[in-house]
Amino acid sequence: MKQIIFDKSLSLFDEVVAIRRKLHKYPELSFCEKETSSVIKDYLASKGIAFETDVAGYGVVATVVGTAVLPGGATIALRADMDALPIKEESSCEYRSVNEGVMHACGHDAHTAMLLGAASIIHDLRGSFSGKIKFVFQPGEEKLPGGASLMLANGALKDVDFVVGQHVFPDLQCGCVGFHQGPFMASCDEVNIIIRGRGGHAAKPSERSNALLAAADIVSRLSKMFPESDTVALRSDGLLCFGSLIADGTYNVVPPQVSMKGTMRTFNENKRASMKSIISALSHDTAALFGCSADVFIENGYPSLINDNALTEKCRLLASEYLDPSKVLDIPQMMTADDFAFYSQAFPSCFYRIGVSNVSKGIDSKQHTSTFDIDEDALQIGTGLMSFIAISLCNNIILL
């Protein structure tokens, strides 16, 4: 089966590359993926694969039912996100974005193309497995409330046993894949704080309450409690980073209010709840010390992404079977977030990373940058690997 899938992924390579380049050239922002959805539907229809449309907006869910009479018979969901980012692409490649200010800078074009290729392979091989495989083409990963939460609310993953997803990763060389068991990616919530004081003349402190001083003290206190650090030991306590502090005063004018915006991240849901309480209480108490008040609003983002230990180990072993075992790596936790986390909170899930960088080809830009690109050789790897994992899981092939 491994060789059959590899050969099919090789024969589909040009198709998958063409799809990826088309999507890259015509990117669409979150929940606006109308033409992207059309590309997906047209390809699935051309392969004779059944699908549902307009799920959670422009989402598409395709299904292939295995016809083999074999033990196992699991239902597996494979997920790809499909939205782009509000970034102006700076590239000279022939497939660079023609939609001004919109770019596939996170690799969702590649995710979609690889999942379409996997759907084609799995459909061709439906006589070799039992069970059911769903292909979830999800809108809106980059924007709250996250397309994953809406797909779940729409029942798109009803009766699913496992969910598997892959994400391009420029920190790994093309040819490698990375796995991590347990808490893998952080939760991500948006922190909004408004400090209200009494504005006035800079030279008359008795006539004003300085909201700017209160805001600065809040940032200082919270930063000591939840420091920015690249070490996992400190990350386990949570990370809070403020990226915006706006005080609309001037040289001799103290503003009546200051707004602050930041991101809050942790791997632990209990810690997530306690951080929210601490941020709110400390902000109110500190503001009061300066004769000010605080309005605190923390918008729930994505929960922490938890890879199921047993499923992730199975997927890692299957990857070692499909690829050169030396290319299958253990990778550390990441403070970045992905709404695949919603699936991981609802079902046993595995979210792994696929390497896409190639320094020798000059492909090494990071995600969410204007020059991001991938070594397209990774498309064949991702297409074949996802197919092999899904069919093996359906047939209950456990390499333990």
What are these regions (language model features)?
Residues 23, 78, 108, 135, ...:
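Divalent metal-coordination and catalytic microenvironments
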Residues 1-21, 27, 124, 128, ...:
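N-terminal hydrophobic/helix-forming segments and targeting peptides
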Residues 216-400:
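Metal-dependent amide/peptide-bond hydrolase catalytic core
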Residues 60, 85-87, 91-103, 110, ...:
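Histidine/acidic-residue-rich, glycine-tolerant segments that coordinate divalent metal ions
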